[in-house]
């Protein structure tokens, strides 16, 4: 139940998102360096997705995320039988050369019990993949998105780019709407 969709963003749109977000790194209070990678929190759960992505450079990312969600629902309509779920947050991530999130993990845990779906949209072409323990690996390709359940059934890890290039990804979660 992994949805892989190419051409959600053009290479030019990916480059614009990378350049815009990287220029914000030094001025953005949401910038975080956790050693393996840097990330900028583009949207938190208490913020409006539409408002945070209203910037013309980020508008294609907004459209890509909505498109990926709709394509997932089209292919796996049973997700509509769940309680209401919506986007929780979006991060822009940059992995330094030779780094990756290389340990096996899933996104649903006691700290995040409401997570339903995970998504990633690759912004750069790299010679590496997101590996799934029980599913096929997904090669990175600029503009390619993937969406999958956040649960242990979709445990995954990343691998470093063998070409020694920086790697850029938009990622986030859809979670149950808690009232």
Protein language model features and the residues they cover:
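Non-heme Fe(II)/2-oxoglutarate
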Residues: 1-84
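Intrinsic-disorder/low-complexity, polar/charged segments enriched in Ser/Thr/Lys/Arg/Asp/Glu/Gln
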Residues: 2-4, 116-118, 169
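Acidic, glycine-rich loop-and-strand cores that form catalytic or ligand-binding grooves
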Residues: 80-96
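Beta-strand elements of modular eukaryotic interaction domains
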Residues: 81, 108-109, 159-160
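Short, conserved beta-strand element in jelly-roll/cupin
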Residues: 92-97, 109-128, 174
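Histidine-centered catalytic micro-motifs
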Residues: 101-109
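Catalytic core of Fe(II)/2-oxoglutarate
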Residues: 104, 115, 125-179
């Amino acid at each position: 139940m992994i949805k892989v969709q190419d051409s959600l963003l053009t290479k030019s749109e990916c480059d614009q998102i990378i350049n815009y977000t990287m220029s914000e790194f030094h001025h953005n209070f949401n910038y975080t360096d956790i050693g393996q990678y840097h990330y900028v929190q583009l949207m938190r759960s208490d913020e409006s997705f539409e408002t945070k992505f209203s910037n013309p450079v980020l508008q294609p990312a907004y459209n890509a995320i909505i498109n990926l969600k709709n394509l997932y629902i089209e292919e796996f309509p049973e997700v509509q039988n769940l309680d209401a779920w919506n986007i929780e947050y979006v991060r822009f991530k940059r992995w330094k050369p030779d780094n990756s999130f290389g340990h096996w993990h899933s996104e649903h845990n006691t700290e995040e019990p409401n997570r339903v779906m995970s998504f990633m949209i690759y912004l750069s072409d790299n010679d590496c993949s997101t590996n799934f323990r029980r599913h096929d690996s997904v090669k990175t390709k600029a503009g390619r998105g993937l969406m999958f359940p956040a649960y242990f059934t979709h445990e995954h890890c990343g691998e470093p780019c063998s070409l020694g290039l920086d790697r850029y990804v938009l990622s986030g979660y859809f979670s149950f709407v808690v009232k």
